[in-house]
Amino acid sequence: MPKTDRVIEEITDYVLEKEITSAEAYTTAGHVLLDTLGCGILALRYPECTKLLGPIVPGTTVPNGSKVPGTSYVLDPVRAAFNIGCMIRWLDYNDTWLAAEWGHPSDNLGGILAAADYVSRVRLSEGKEPLTVRDVLEMMIKAHEIQGVLALENSLNRVGLDHVLFVKVATTAVAAKLLGGGREEIKNALSNAWIDNAALRTYRHSPNTGSRKSWAAGDATSRGVHLALMSLKGEMGYPTALSAPGWGFQDVLFNKKEIKLARPLDAYVMENVLFKVSYPAEFHAQTAAESAVILHPQVKNRIDEIDRVVIRTHESAIRIIDKKGPLHNPADRDHCLQYITAIGLLFGDITAQHYEAETANDPRIDKLRDKMEVTENKTYTEDYLKPDKRSISNAVQVHFKDGTSTEMVECEFPLGHRFRREEAVPKLLEKFSDNLKTHFPDKQHKHIYERCTSYETLQTMRVNEFVDMFCM
């Protein structure tokens, strides 16, 4: 057999052997866990999300199955991973990673939590000790790192592929480890994840933007669990899945460029991950949203007097969310820089409801969008790519018909950035509490919040007991 591709070897070594020593990474992972589950709980208010949940065949029962938070479903770990992953991503309100490729590393929690809960319940049935939340946090750190470091220099979007491939790869690696896989099983599963290929980005762009972007990560993380389970049954792998001449991923799909890990795998991504604290909007627009909300008091009574709105931004924002013309659904609207900015200017806040038809039918929104000029600021683009800065800058200025204007409101770092972490954490916990309140009775909400916000209690909790707290 040929020598295994280096990237597959490095990821396998990392998952099996790397000890995570960063206290900051574990603390941040705890916040990611709560924030991500809170986003999933909030999504249960939306029928378009909940219609996709549950067993694929009604009435299916699974002994020692994985439970789906916020529901009464007990599913096999593959289907549970889809359910949890779908909930997490539905409102585009969980964490974000921005680099040559974009993504949301907490999407991997769908597969991680489903696998960990399943393993814990099986162990208990055998009289063994279950996994703890600390084990989940470690796998979250590692999944974040795998997905995020792959994203640093490997741009899937440049070749029309969706970022959820990196979710599938990351989940595959850590799920195989959680389920009891060793070196060969993890390598075999990883090779199959690459050979699977990736979803196209068709559903993220006009004229086809649609709800698949809200369940694509659930699909990817569940596939990761599926491949991990297959490898544990002895399914073979393919050592040069990436590099095989003519037939490997690199030659067929990546313009014959090498897939590489831009830095050693440790805890960099979890330490630097971006939270969506304030607004459920595509992350490249977060600072535009903050700027627009700041300007709201100055413009709210002068909307009809606006001549133009100037937005200065970075190249990635222009490529992903600079949209003109009709927007067809919530998935289209929450990925439109101009729509998000207009909502901030008009209402002084941005919530998930603002993407629904009731708000979108307000004629003032499209009138404002038509008056917007989006231009690239080269410095913003450069700072976006600097590893020690990673800013996501936007600036907004409103010009009126009488020749006056507001100041140019610039925001470099959104509230969820590492540079603003101390400021963000109290608001992040408030967001978690608010999301719980949308679904759980007061007593259950209080019980979950108190146990989860004590870090020592959280990390030592058994996984099955942690999940049980969130179930109906």
Swiss-Prot record:
GO MF annotation: an example: 2 iron, 2 sulfur cluster binding
Induction profile: Subject to catabolite repression.
Keywords: Lyase, Sporulation, Tricarboxylic acid cycle
Catalysed reaction, written as an equation: 2-methylcitrate = 2-methyl-cis-aconitate + H2O; citrate = cis-aconitate + H2O
Single GO BP term: sporulation resulting in formation of a cellular spore
Gene3D superfamilies cross-referenced by the UniProt entry: 2-methylcitrate dehydratase PrpD
Enzyme Commission numbers on file: 4.2.1.-
Pfam families: MmgE_PrpD_C, MmgE_PrpD_N
Keyword check for Lyase: yes
InterPro entries given in the database record: 2Me_IsoCit_deHydtase_PrpD, MmgE/PrpD_sf, MmgE/PrpD_sf_1, MmgE/PrpD_sf_2, MmgE_PrpD, MmgE_PrpD_C, MmgE_PrpD_N
Domain of life: Bacteria
EC supergroup of this enzyme: lyase
UniProt family annotation: Belongs to the PrpD family.
Described purpose of this protein according to its UniProt entry: Involved in both the tricarboxylic acid (TCA) and methylcitric acid cycles. Has both 2-methylcitrate dehydratase and citrate dehydratase activities. Catalyzes the dehydration of 2-methylcitrate (2-MC) to yield 2-methyl-cis-aconitate, and the dehydration of citrate to yield cis-aconitate. Cannot form isocitrate. Uses either (2S,3R)- or (2R,3S)-2-methylcitrate.
The protein, known as: Citrate/2-methylcitrate dehydratase
Organism from which the protein derives: Bacillus subtilis (strain 168)
Gene name per UniProt: mmgE
